[in-house]
Amino acid sequence: YWFLKDKTLGQVMVGHIPQASQHAAVLVDGSGTMVAANWTPINSLAVGLTRNGVELTAPNPGLGLPVVGFPVGAAMWCGSTSLPTGGNCEPISIDGVRYDSPTFAGFSASASWGADDFWDVALRYAGEISGFKFAAVAAYYHNSDERAYTGFNTVVGTSNPLKRDAGYFQAGAYLQHVKSGLFLYGAYGKEYNDNILDDGNAFKLGIPGNLTAEQPDGHVWYIKAGIRQNWLPLGATVLYGEYEERNDMFHPDMIALGVDGSQNKQWGLGLVQEIDAAAMSLWLTYRNYETSFSGPGVAGAFDNLDDIDVVTAGAMISF
């Protein structure tokens, strides 16, 4: 992309841009744990749902098709972008135009637009008050482009949208007591879905388009608390705990299987160690996922799902 920037008038970007709401709630997290732990489920497809130790699969209609497994991302679905990334529902840059205002007393605003159509707006604040760091954002995104974000559906064999009309609101805030290093971060997201999917693709079982129009408006909330202190000469050490709930953010193809509601609960603990001399962060994290579905087709098929435990070690060098 290319851009024009002026200290007084702000900045305009044109091309393959990060939209105004992209990662909005994630990026206000100033704890140093933003990459190691946020509300984006980076392993949503790598981890499969199981019941009594057996992988959960869709019914096989006897057409010689491969068996379809259910990753935990089936309960983390973003209707506005057809991606298993709830609540970070706008993670991918797209072609468009974006404007960012100058900062006034800690406040700034952004807006972006792209053809066929998407648009979004965001309002941000960052500052320090009475020994506390504080940052917050609120953003809204609307997408009515059926052609956008269809590659994922095609690859995994789920239904593409015939009509996309979906919005997503998100808000996030971060508060840290500077002297003690104690911090609190929270985020909330709400979907507004009015999509209609291809009525013949859902697990090859067939799903009427009028049913997919009944996909609920899911919501998600996330909270993280901890302490950030320079206990070692290497750099800051961060200890944290997190909790998240995603409600009714299931993939709409599951309506064909009698699902009309879902809940995904997540909690975790983690340690991040910064190494200032190398611009590096090291982390070790643990997460537990508890997933459930509800509806007339759930009993005996999707009930009593096993919890999922995930341990992750990682490193990042910033340059």
Whereabouts are the PLM-identified features?
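Outer-membrane beta-barrel "beta-signal"
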Residues: 307-319
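Detector for outer-membrane/organellar transmembrane beta-barrel domains
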Residues: 122-274
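C-terminal closing repeat unit and adjoining cap/tail of repeat-based domains
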Residues: 270-291
